[in-house]
Amino acid sequence: VRDAYIAKPHNCVYECARNEYCNDLCTKDGAKSGYCQWVGKYGNGCWCIELPDNVPIRIPGNCH
């Protein structure tokens, strides 16, 4: 498990405005919790706590 930005296909973050949206998204994929990281490295994106290793995360490089 790891703490990371959860990724959509093509290495894009899930953009957000509310913590509840990210918490629901992250826990649905098996994370302990999640919140909306405002003005982070990739803008406003969902950050997950203890996200399982099999779930894609945002990695360095372009969002396609």
From Swiss-Prot:
InterPro entries in alphabetical order: LCN-type_CS_alpha_beta_dom (IPR044062), Scorpion_toxin-like (IPR003614), Scorpion_toxin-like_sf (IPR036574), Scorpion_toxinL (IPR018218), Scorpion_toxinL/defensin (IPR002061)
Transmembrane segments: none
Entry-linked CDD domains: neurotoxins_LC_scorpion
A GO cellular component annotation in the UniProt record: extracellular region
Protein family (similarity comment): Belongs to the long (4 C-C) scorpion toxin superfamily. Sodium channel inhibitor family. Alpha subfamily.
Key words, A-Z: Disulfide bond, Ion channel impairing toxin, Neurotoxin, Secreted, Toxin, Voltage-gated sodium channel impairing toxin
Name of the molecule in the record: Neurotoxin BmK-II
UniProt main location, coarse: secreted
Coiled coil: none
Tissue expr: Expressed by the venom gland.
Boundaries of every LCN-type CS-alpha/beta domain copy: 2-64
GO molecular function: sodium channel inhibitor activity; toxin activity
GO BP of this protein: defense response
Disulfide bridge partners, by residue number: C12-C63, C16-C36, C22-C46, C26-C48
Stored Gene3D superfamilies: Knottin, scorpion toxin-like
Subcellular location per the Swiss-Prot or TrEMBL entry: Secreted
PROSITE patterns: LCN_CSAB
Domain of life: Eukaryota
Comment, domains: Has the structural arrangement of an alpha-helix connected to antiparallel beta-sheets by disulfide bonds (CS-alpha/beta).
Lineage: Eukaryota, Metazoa, Ecdysozoa, Arthropoda, Chelicerata
Annotated function: Binds to sodium channels (Nav) and inhibits the inactivation of the activated channels, thereby blocking neuronal transmission. This toxin is active against mammals and insects. BmK-II is 6-fold less toxic than BmK-I.
Stored SMART domains: Knot1
